[in-house]
Design a protein with these regions (language model features):
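Phosphate-handling DNA/RNA-contact segment within nucleic-acid enzymes
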Residues: 1-54, 58, 71-72
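Short, surface-exposed helix-loop/turn micro-motifs enriched in polar/charged residues
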Residues: 16-19, 35, 50, 67, ...
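C-terminal or mid-to-C-terminal helical accessory/interaction module adjacent to the motor/catalytic core
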Residues: 86-169
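Alpha-helical scaffold segments in soluble metabolic enzymes
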Residues: 4-7, 26, 50, 74, ...
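Conserved catalytic cores of soluble enzyme domains
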Residues: 10, 41-96, 102-109
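Short, flexible active-site loop motifs that bind/organize anionic cofactors or intermediates
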Residues: 17, 38, 62, 90, ...
Length: 170
């Protein structure tokens, strides 16, 4: 659906990336045209490079269940080193374990788009996912978490951005 989605680019330069074909069909038939399917839970560097040629602000919106959230985290951590000031990645997690198909059928376009406005940039998504899993009173867990975050930040290829993301995290 990339060919149709790129014809619907808006001033926000966003595209919604969902897991499956039915998600695309439901969103598209609801009037959301800037949507593409990843056909699964993996997203490669090659795929994101192609997407970035047309959209600088992709929004990953996988299923809101546990497996969808874990898949989104894997994507976030894999693509995190590639971000720069022109090409970003955002994440939107649907509530109550919903997938985009079910969510839009139950809530409609307006509420879906309203929910998308709460998207998180990749570094915030990673931070929030991990910070909610650790015992904040356990110095060993905090230390391990800080080391993992630093390691991820050092992987950012854009040196200037790396500096500011590190400052933001720590």
């Amino acid at each position: 659906n990339l060919d149709k989605a790129k014809d619907c680019r808006s001033e926000t330069n966003e595209v919604i990336i969902v897991e499956g074909y039915m998600d695309v069909v439901s969103l598209y038939s609801s009037g959301i045209k800037n949507v593409i399917a990843n056909s699964g839970t993996a997203l490669t560097e090659r795929q994101i490079d192609i997407i970035w040629k047309f959209f600088s602000n992709p929004i990953i919106c996988l299923d809101g269940d546990i497996s969808g959230q874990k898949a989104a985290l894997r994507i976030a951590e894999k693509l995190f080193p590639l971000i720069n000031e022109e090409n970003k990645i955002y994440f939107s997690t649907l509530p109550n374990g919903n997938d985009p198909d079910d969510f839009i059928k139950q809530n409609g376009k307006k509420i879906f788009l309203s929910h998308l406005k709460e998207k998180q940039v990749v570094q915030t998504y990673i931070w929030n996912f991990h910070i909610n899993k650790i015992d904040k009173n356990n110095p060993f867990e905090i230390s391990k978490f800080e080391k993992e975050i630093k390691k991820m930040c050092y992987s950012i290829k854009d040196e200037t951005l790396k500096k500011y993301v590190l400052e933001d995290f720590l």
